[in-house]
């Protein structure tokens, strides 16, 4: 086993920052020491196998992206990142664990969907990975399978109030699944949008000839998000199920979550970088360009981008500060323009939903520190510590302390990152919704369980290094 000393940096946690050296032995952190400590009677730097100089830099726990979709089947195609390409991109961006979504659809057995996801990921990942379980078909069989997931290390499942005919669950199905969630402690994750209402609005728009990507966001009105969020909260209240609402983008949905939390409910919410930075107005602007009005397809995701005029983006930042929202995940769901997004050229409903961001989450959220939206500590909390606690990984992940996995990022606040397909892009996509974003900060070194994956602008990872994470129940419940 080899030893590494990360020396001279500022160790940042969710609760504070301290000048300290971090000693790694094999895959674990074994000590957090006073800078230059000679507590053991000698200068550690001269006896360890490797020294990483972190002078002037932040030393943070590796990012945990708790919402990704590698190879997700959607709209007649598949998300374009494999577990291999997507986890390499994650590592480049300072994310050392992901939680992806195994898929079960109507008529399929949960166990089969899960086994398939294990096949896709095993031996292919560069960073550690866990799974949530999508229940796309709630029936007696899938309900019976839910409690058994806990022994498999899968302690959360997602249902959809959107996408009728695909992944959709009605209220009766949701109620039954939530009763099991309440009994077992499994976290219910919810895609909270009123799908039937959205589908009618979308059909009406298309009939009026409004077929461009921008109308995706018009059909998916914030009222549909607020209403579904409220309904999910009420069903969680009725059953006692812990509820985690994914990809929140409407300020009205945040207000629903805040009220429920004020009432003492175990209700949580995540947002994603796109809802902090991008807007419906930008998507409108992309209607008249070289793509013939279609460039807005790169912004098509659900929930959709919201109007900046209505102030949703500022409200999301505020909710992150006040803990009305607890986490930032990417909902990484990449599709290329060519042959994928293009499927919806004549009808926005056929555009596969999703944006690729796994590589940029740590940088984009650090930009919130630079602009004063969040503190340094909150950056770590939102991107690593809370994801670990929320999804049963805390202690081994999400923190720099003795005994934890040595998942560590050395982040240079004086570095710079220019995001662009030809610059810093390792995701398997032919475009980036983040093209042209400039970040004051840089992911310098990325370590996963003691192994350096990225340093000096070079990738040293090997596929298969990433291990499956058997998760415990949430450590975040009140
Ligand atoms: O646009 C999105 N979010 N695509 C992925 C599927 C989902 O609903 O998370
Ligand atoms: Zn969703
Ligand atoms: Zn998603």
Place the predicted regions along the sequence by residue.
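Divalent metal-coordination and catalytic microenvironments
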Residues: 9, 27, 56, 67, ...
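Alpha-helix-loop-beta-strand connector modules within alpha/beta enzyme cores
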Residues: 111-127, 175-190
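His/Asp/Glu-enriched, well-ordered alpha-helical/loop segment
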Residues: 210-240, 292, 296-299, 322-328, ...
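Histidine/acidic residue-rich metal-binding segments in metalloenzymes
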Residues: 141-328, 344
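C-terminal cap of metal-dependent C-N hydrolases
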Residues: 342-347, 353, 402-469
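Short catalytic-loop micro-motif centered on adjacent basic/acidic residues
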Residues: 99-100, 130-133, 242-247
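Metal-associated gating/positioning segment near the N- to mid-region
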Residues: 45, 54-124, 141
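N-terminal metal-binding scaffold of metallo-dependent hydrolase/deaminase domains
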Residues: 1-46
């Amino acid at each position: 086993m080899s030893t590494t000393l990360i020396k001279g940096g500022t160790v940042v946690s969710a609760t504070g920052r301290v000048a300290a050296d971090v000693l790694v032995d094999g895959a674990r952190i074994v000590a957090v020491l006073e800078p230059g400590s000679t507590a053991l009677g000698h200068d550690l730097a001269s006896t360890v196998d490797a020294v990483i100089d972190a002078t002037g830099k932040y030393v943070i726990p590796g990012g945990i992206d708790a919402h990704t979709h590698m190879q997700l089947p959607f709209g007649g195609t598949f998300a374009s990142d494999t577990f291999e390409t997507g986890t390499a991109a994650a590592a480049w961006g300072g994310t050392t664990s992901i939680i992806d979504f195994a898929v079960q659809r109507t008529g399929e057995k949960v166990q089969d969907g899960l086994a398939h996801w294990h096949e896709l990921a095993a031996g292919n990942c560069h960073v550690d990975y866990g799974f949530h379980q999508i229940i796309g078909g709630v029936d007696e069989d899938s309900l019976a399978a839910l409690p058994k997931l806990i022994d498999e290390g899968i302690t959360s499942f997602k249902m959809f109030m959107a996408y009728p005919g695909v992944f959709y669950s009605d209220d009766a199905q949701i109620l039954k699944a939530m009763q099991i969630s309440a009994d077992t402690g499994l976290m219910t994750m919810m895609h909270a949008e009123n799908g039937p209402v959205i589908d009618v609005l979308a059909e009406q728009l298309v009939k009026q000839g409004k077929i461009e990507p921008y109308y995706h966001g018009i059909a998916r009105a914030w009222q549909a998000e607020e209403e579904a969020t409220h309904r999910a909260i009420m069903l969680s209240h009725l059953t006692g199920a812990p509820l985690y609402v994914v990809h929140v983008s409407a300020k009205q949905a945040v207000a629903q979550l805040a009220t429920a939390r004020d009432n003492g409910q175990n209700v949580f919410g995540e947002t994603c970088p796109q809802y902090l930075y991008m807007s419906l107005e930008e998507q409108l602007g992309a209607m008249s360009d070289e793509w013939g009005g279609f460039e807005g397809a790169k912004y098509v995701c659900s929930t959709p981008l919201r109007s900046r005029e209505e102030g949703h983006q500022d409200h999301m930042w505020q909710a992150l500060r006040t803990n009305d929202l607890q986490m930032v995940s990417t909902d990484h769901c990449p599709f290329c323009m060519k042959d994928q997004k293009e499927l919806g050229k004549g009808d926005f409903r056929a555009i596969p939903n999703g944006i690729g961001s796994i590589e940029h989450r740590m940088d984009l959220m650090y930009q919130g520190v630079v602009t004063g939206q969040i503190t340094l500590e909150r950056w770590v909390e939102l991107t690593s510590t809370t994801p670990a606690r929320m999804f049963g990984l805390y202690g081994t992940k999400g923190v720099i302390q003795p005994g934890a996995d040595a998942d560590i990022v050395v982040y240079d606040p004086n570095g710079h990152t220019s995001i662009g397909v030809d610059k810093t892009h390792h995701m398997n996509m032919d475009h980036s919704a983040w093209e042209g974003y400039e970040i004051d900060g840089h992911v310098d070194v990325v370590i996963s369980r003691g192994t350096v994956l990225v340093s000096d602008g070079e990738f040293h990872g090997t596929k298969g290094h990433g291990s499956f994470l058997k998760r415990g129940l949430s450590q975040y419940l009140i």
